[in-house]
Amino acid sequence: MSVNLNNNKNNKNKVAIGFISGSLASICATTVTNPIELVKTRLQLQGELQLSQRIYNGVWDAFKQIYKTEGIRGLQSGLIPAYFSQATMQGIRLGSFDLISNALGAKPNQDYFFLKNLLAGATAGAIGAAAGSPFDLVKVRMQAANMYKNDPQFVGYSSSFAAFKQIIQKEGFKGLTRGMLTSAQRTAVGSAIQLSTYGSCKNLVLNFVDDGIYAYIISSMVAGFIVTFGMNPFDVARTRLYFQGKGNSHGEIYKGLMDCVYKTVKKEGFGAVYKGFWAHYLRLGPHTILTLVFWEQFKKLFSGEL
């Protein structure tokens, strides 16, 4: 009986450590990568269905223009909701991954280890993304605001709290769930690729490199590169679904993920679903590395291993 109680206590501690470590790791990473996230958001929205003009000629041009006209503060637009989004999503995603993986019986060098990690990553990612989606919606709208400041029908927000308040007033609570399913699908795909690739790559790397920061970085670089290609079409659709609504002159133009992808490809060509790809990679690569490295270190810290 006492053994079972101790096991339950240890499992609860592992979940708590995983959640707290994931949240703190994502906040640290977000502070560094938010400017490139803002650039990615604007690149994905410009030229939308040929209804808006093209402002930026790539990642570097966007970064320079935003810094020149809006300064450092402009590059960190949406940072507060980004913190809440990442802490919620990554805390749940990283905190529950080991729990789900263990429940599925995923163990290195055993049958179906990769597939079980894939399922665990997708499930953990979808749950985390759905929980953090309202914060992501507010973040996207705040990051895009200065692109549409001359649009008389666009409603800007003075703060994250004001954004939530205005969205609820104009669109109802349902407005905060806009794009939630697409966000869950996007992150399920990304998490499945990232976490399963990271785990498998880490096990391979450990055959040649001692367990430590270099092993984490190499594993994270591989996971970050692969996940960008798989996620970008979902990411473009999610950004556009978040931004549409009663707060801009375009109004309701998409019914969901597939409708958004179809209309985007039809009006802008197939390459449009890869808008912001390099910004996405430049953000996701370092963000993946920083998040997973911080995650490993925080887990060791809270477990008393450091």
Swiss-Prot record:
Subcellular location: Mitochondrion inner membrane
Main subcellular location: mitochondrion
Solcar repeats: 13-103, 112-204, 211-301
PROSITE patterns named in the record: SOLCAR (PS50920)
One Gene Ontology cellular component: mitochondrion
Mitochondrial matrix side: 37-83, 139-174, 233-276
Family the UniProt entry places it in: Belongs to the mitochondrial carrier (TC 2.A.29) family.
Note: Present with 5350 molecules/cell in log phase SD medium.
Name of protein: Mitochondrial substrate carrier family protein ucpA
Source species of the chain: Dictyostelium discoideum (Social amoeba)
Lineage: Eukaryota, Amoebozoa, Evosea, Eumycetozoa, Dictyostelia
Gene: ucpA
